[in-house]
Amino acid sequence: MALLGTILLPLLGFALLGLFGKRMREPLPGVLASGLVLASFLLGAGLLLSGGARFQAEWLPGIPFSLLLDNLSGFMLLIVTGVGFLIHVYAIGYMGGDPGYSRFFAYFNLFIAMMLTLVLADSYPVMFIGWEGVGLASFLLIGFWYKNPQYADSARKAFIVNRIGDLGFMLGMAILWALYGTLSISELKEAMEGPLKNPDLLALAGLLLFLGAVGKSAQIPLMVWLPDAMAGPTPVSALIHAATMVTAGVYLIARSSFLYSVLPDVSYAIAVVGLLTAAYGALSAFGQTDIKKIVAYSTISQLGYMFLAAGVGAYWVALFHVFTHAFFKALLFLASGSVIHALGGEQDVRKMGGLWKHLPQTRWHALIGALALGGLPLLSGFWSKDAILAATLTYPFGGVGFYVGALLVAVLTAMYAMRWFVLVFLGEERGHHHPHEAPPVMLWPNHLLALGSVLAGYLALPHPLPNVLEPFLKPALAEVEAHHLSLGAEWGLIALSAAVALLGLWAGFVFFQRKVFPAWYLAFEAASREAFYVDRAYNALIVNPLKALAEALFYGDRGLLSGYFGLGGAARSLGQGLARLQTGYLRVYALLFVLGALLLLGVMRW
C-alpha cells in the first residue's frame, strides 16, 4: 500500500488544489504541491532502500492493477520526483502573480502522479493509464495560457500527434495478448525466456510498441509536436520536455528489453531512427531564434542518442543518459526561464546578448548546462555521451556506422550549445534594458541542478574506474552480451570523444561571435530555422488534404441530411397549405370547382 502512496500523494495535491486552490493565497498552492512531490520522493527512496515493493489489486478480469518498485522503476521514480520537486520549487517564483497559479500546480501534481503510474506499472494496461494520463496533463500544461489561440493550437497538435503513437501502443498490446494471453510485464518476461511464439508477429508487436515510444519521445517522424510545446510556461518545458515525459519512450524500450533483446531487426531499426533523430534535432537547433526552441530541438537530438543506445542493446547506457540529461536539460530550460523573467518575457535570442554582466548567477547555470550538453570532459554529459559512443562499438546491434554518425552529432551538439550561450550572454547588448536577476526561490533549484550537471556522470565511470549504475540497473534489464575493449582502446575512444567535444565547443565559441556569416551558413540557417520544412511538408501532404476531405464530408453530410429532413418538411408544409383550403364554406368549394374545370378545359384544348 505504501507503494501506491507514492502516486496518491501528488494525486491528492491535484484534488485539493483543484477543489480549494482558488481560496489559497500565493505561494501556498506551490508550497503544498512541492511538499507532496518531496514526500513522494522520500517515500519512494525509503521503499527502494528497503529492497523494493509490490502492489496488486483486482481491476479487470485477467488484468490486475499491479505496481512494481524494482531498481529500474525506482531509478525513474527518483528522477521524476527529485528533479520534479526542484522544478516545482522554481515554479513557485516563476508563476508568481499568474491568475491561474493554483490551477498550474494542480496540473503539475496531476502530471507527476500519472508519470509515476507509468514508471511503476507492472503491466502494459496500467502503464497505458499513466501514458495517457501524462498526455492529458501535458495537453493541459502546454495550453495553460489557453486564451492565446496559438498556444491552444500547440496543445492540440501535441495531443493529436501523440495519439498516432498511442494507437501503435494499443495494437502492440493486442498482439501480445493474442500471443501470450497476458499483459503482465513480469509474466511476459518469464514467457519469453523460452521458445518464442510466432516471431514475425512478435516483431510486429515490438514495432508497434516502438511507435508508441516514437510519439511520446518525439522521434522521427513524430517529432514535430515538441518544439511547438514550448508554448507552455518554462517550468512545463523543464519538467515534461526535458526530465520526465519525453523520456517515457526510452523507459518503455528499457522496460520491454526482454522483448527487444530477442528482436535484432527491430532493435536495429530503433538504433537507426535514434541516430537520424539525433542528427535532425542537432541540425535544426542551429537556426532557431527562440531561446526555448533551441533547447527543445536539442532535447529531440538527445532523445535520439538515448534511442540509439537502447537500439544497439545498451539499455543501461540509455538510462544513464536519461539521468544526466534530466539535470543539464532541466537546468538549460530553467536558466532560459530566468533570462525570460529578467527580460520581461522576451524570448528572441537576437534581442539578447551581453547578459553575462547582468545575471551573475544565471550566467553560471547557463554555462554549466551548455558545457554539459556539449560534452565538456569531466561534466556529466561527457560521461554518458561517451558511454553511448562506446556502446555503438561493443554491443551486438551496433556498428562502426553508428559510431561515426554519433561522433559527428557530438560535434554539432557542442557547436549549437555554444551558439545558444554566445547569443544570449556574450557580445553586445541588443534590445533589452535593465535586466534583473531571478529571486532566490528560482535560483536555488538551479544551483542543485548545476551540481547534478557536474556530478551525475560519476555514477558510471568507464573501466577500470567505479561504475555504480550499471550493476544497479542490469538485474532489471535483459542480458545482452557486449564484448569488452582493451583498456588502451577504451581510453583511446574516450580521448577521441573529449577531443571532438572540445573542438566543437571551441568552434562554436569562435564562429558565433562573428558579426557577418558566410553565405553558405546563412542558407543553412534559413533551412534550419524552418526545421528543414518537415512541418510544411506534413501540412501540404497530410494535414491540408485531410482537412479538405473532412470539410467535404461535413458539407456533404449537412446537404444530405438537409435533403432527407427537407422531404418531410416539404410534405408537412404541403399538407398544412392544403388544410387551409378546407374552410367549410360551399361558395369556396364551388369557386375551386369552376377554376379546376376551366384549367382542365384549357389543358385539353392546348
From Swiss-Prot:
Gene3D superfamilies noted in UniProt: 1.20.5.2700
Top-rank taxon, per record: Bacteria
Query: Which organism encodes this protein?
Result: Thermus thermophilus (strain ATCC 27634 / DSM 579 / HB8)
Return the protein name.
NADH-quinone oxidoreductase subunit 12
Q: What keywords are assigned to this protein?
A: Cell inner membrane, Cell membrane, Membrane, NAD, Quinone, Translocase, Transmembrane, Transmembrane helix
Reaction(s) the record says it catalyses: a quinone + NADH + 5 H(+)(in) = a quinol + NAD(+) + 4 H(+)(out)
Q: What top-tier enzyme class does this entry carry?
A: translocase
Give the GO molecular function terms: NADH dehydrogenase (ubiquinone) activity; quinone binding
Q: Name the Gene Ontology biological process terms.
A: ATP synthesis coupled electron transport; electron transport coupled proton transport
Xref: Pfam families: Proton_antipo_M, Proton_antipo_N
Q: How does it sit in the membrane?
A: Multi-pass membrane protein
Q: Where in the cell is it found?
A: Cell inner membrane
What gene is behind this protein? nqo12
Q: Which family does it belong to?
A: Belongs to the complex I subunit 5 family.
Assembly state and interactors?
NDH-1 is composed of 15 different subunits, Nqo1 to Nqo15. The complex has a L-shaped structure, with the hydrophobic arm (subunits Nqo7, Nqo8 and Nqo10 to Nqo14) embedded in the membrane and the hydrophilic peripheral arm (subunits Nqo1 to Nqo6, Nqo9 and Nqo15) protruding into the bacterial cytoplasm. The hydrophilic domain contains all the redox centers.
Q: Which GO terms describe its cellular component?
A: plasma membrane
- Locate the coiled-coil region(s) and give their ranges: none
Q: Where are the transmembrane segments?
A: 1-21, 29-49, 75-95, 104-124, 126-146, 165-185, 206-226, 234-254, 266-286, 303-323, 325-345, 364-384, 397-417, 441-461, 492-512, 584-604
Q: What does this protein do?
A: NDH-1 shuttles electrons from NADH, via FMN and iron-sulfur (Fe-S) centers, to quinones in the respiratory chain. The immediate electron acceptor for the enzyme in this species is menaquinone. Couples the redox reaction to proton translocation (for every two electrons transferred, four hydrogen ions are translocated across the cytoplasmic membrane), and thus conserves the redox energy in a proton gradient required for the synthesis of ATP.
The EC number of this protein is 7.1.1.-
